[in-house]
């Protein structure tokens, strides 16, 4: 008798009930918006606004307002939907203006989902945010919660004809998998409700069991960290054209401390497809996960757990059945790096791109750099695009020859072109405190200082020009992608972290825990020792992560289901 995996799980979670009863993500959000007494969204709406691209929290003001016996002052984070990470420079002017005038922090945050987000929007100005985005052709629908999130793309589609084709496929996939509900337009843009029944032919009435992430990648660069994502399309080319995709599925990095039923996992190969099958295969992968994914335990609801439960071959056969096709054998591909290439690049149409490093992706001005002001000046002059990268940096692209010198002068004078170490350029941190509701340890706010201390260690041993992929996450939810780093810190409690080592340079190996629940000072002592022996004993051009595996400092993670925790 054939097993029906859709019926394996019986009792659904609270989140499933919320989606079921939400009337296609409407809930009573409109009522909460009309309520001028409370600052936030209540009940089910607290969860539902995430489908509209927002998170709510008050943690940076909670203690102070509790002591003053005041009602919580909630503020929202809003994340834009920006498939492929591209935005016209002129549209940036509106984004900058909104951040300056309508957020508590006055900053813009680039994230590693290749888009930007605002922090500190009060409820009374939320509609203004959505209307502003709508005026420049953007929205925030589906950038959070149980849907296909922002689709990532290799960063610079202007670099070659292949990159331009990649760019077009990202748009097709993103639009194809977007929620069809009219709730977003009705609530945030005051669009009149039409007396028809909503339908979600791909996502379904209760949407997906958990968040779902997709990438489109042009080898040999893995800047999007494809192995961390649910569904990935690796471009295969012939005669300067994309002819098909290798399809990989089931990647993900979130864990729960101490819960051995959770584990990170690298995306695995399904097979090769020709271009005309792309959308039907994408739909079939998503709907298989929709129907078979775990809706009773959100900690085991991601695609990788579905594959582990039913087996890759069974999952693959179901996708082939739904798409009415058969996967071909994987085509050869390889990766050489995943970092951004900073500085000037000449594009195929003879204009220019300038990639600039943005520490932590945080766009603001301070006494050392005028990043926000500099980008604003460039946006006023520039006729091309800003392209956001999955490493939280910006590519100023399609720069005309006549503007190149002026843009370079602005970039230099505002600190956008500035020599920093390779270690710093390849570092990353999630937002964490004070605005992330899941944070349990510092991340973004300490990264720069921590990198300086590691830079000093590397200088001491004469290897200050070397690259180490170092990342910090304020909780084990995976946003900082620390579990694909050569050195990864994951917050365990305030001021304490688990230290993981042994990932590789291209992001295709999960690191192993080296020390648990230790302070920053203890971490630096351990790193001093490890970097010292690496500098002395490494083989020619041997990377740090490869060295600690070869030296048996930690065991290589081969199958994280069995050996990540052991």
From Swiss-Prot:
PANTHER family: SULFITE REDUCTASE [NADPH] SUBUNIT BETA, SULFITE REDUCTASE [NADPH] SUBUNIT BETA-RELATED. It is an enzyme of class 1 (oxidoreductase). This is Putative sulfite reductase [NADPH] hemoprotein beta-component. One of its GO terms (molecular function) is metal ion binding. Keywords: 4Fe-4S, Amino-acid biosynthesis, Cysteine biosynthesis, Heme, Iron, Iron-sulfur, Metal-binding, NADP, Oxidoreductase. Its EC number is 1.8.1.2. The gene is cysI. One of its GO terms (biological process) is cysteine biosynthetic process.
